[in-house]
Structures are given as structure tokens and as C-alpha cells.
Amino acid sequence: PMSVANALTQWGSALQQDKYLSTFAEENPPKATIAVCEPRPLFDPMALQTRARKDGDSYVLNGEKSLVPLAAEAELFLVAAQVEDGPAVFIIEGGSEGLTVGDDPAMGIRASAQRPLTLDNVRVAAENRLGNGDFDYRAFVDLGTLAWCSLAIGTCQAVLDYVGPYCNER
């Protein structure tokens, strides 16, 4: 959830910040996640296959995401998609029509509850596109990479915590 709050703080418009940021300070903040990864080999976050097509005062998103943490429980998604002028990120509320969460295929890192996400003609208001022309997609991806690194470090620590006593008892 904090990655989403950080992205909204850094790039969200005043309207987006007013609508979503205060909920992260509540006793029970919303479960929120970022969906960038796509299910293909050698995934490049700068060459997205998920598309967002402008349609009047909204965008229509189509595509698939993989390894989306907390996807089944998320109330708020930041979804990366390709638009005419390059990659963009959209704020999508959980339960939106056309947004489907798949089964949990993850082996090992079950604590993050990673699941695939399918977007089938998901309509999003144009005001839910992150940023006001100042959005830096590369920096957004870099922050997401840091989150993945912290997940990997935590997993390695859990392995050490488990293996140390096991080896000592053998």
C-alpha cells in the first residue's frame, strides 16, 4: 500500500491526492497494489502490451498483468498501460467492470499473494491517469524495483531464520 501512497504523493494530481491519500492515514488503510509486470518472457516495463485507448473523457484498458501482489484483496490498483505517447499509469478501483483477478500461481512467496490480473475493456475516467504532465514513468518503475528488492531481502531473511535452527538441530 505504501508504494501506491508514495506514487500518489509524488505524481498524483490535487484531485487524485484529495480523493485517495487521506484514506492511507486511516486506522484501516485501503489494500492497494501496483500492476506493471506482464506474463511474457524477458518482460520490459518500457514496452507494455497492456493498452489504454482514449475514448472521450475516459480510457479503455485491455491486457494482462502478472505477479500482482495482494490482487485478490486490493481496493485500489495502479496499472501501467501503453498509450499513444508512451507508458502511463492509471488508478483503477477494485471491482471495476472488466477487471478480473486470476488464481494464485506463485510458488514460494505466498505472503505477497501474487495473482494475475486481466483487464477486459476496463473503462477509467481520464482524470484517473496518474500525473499532470509531470509523470516520470522510469522513476515509477525504479521505485517498484526497490519494492521487489525489499521483498526478496525479506524472503532471504526468512530462509535464514528457518534454515539456521534446522541445520543446528541436525
Model-derived regions: residue spans:
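Glycine-rich beta->alpha junctions and the first turn(s) of the following alpha-helix
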Residues: V101-R170
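A short, Trp-centered hydrophobic/proline-enriched beta-strand micro-motif
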Residues: E27-P39
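Internal helix-loop-helix
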Residues: P1-P29, V68-L76
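A short core secondary-structure module
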Residues: E64-G102
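Short, solvent-exposed loop/turn elements at beta->coil junctions and helix N-caps
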Residues: C37-P41, S66-L67, D104-M107
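A structural signal for short hydrophobic beta-strand segments in well-ordered beta-sheet cores
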Residues: T50-R53
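Residue-level signal for inorganic ion chemistry
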Residues: S13, V79, F90, L119, ...
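Short glycine/proline-enriched turns and hinge-like loops at secondary-structure junctions
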Residues: D44-M46, L70-A74, R110-A111
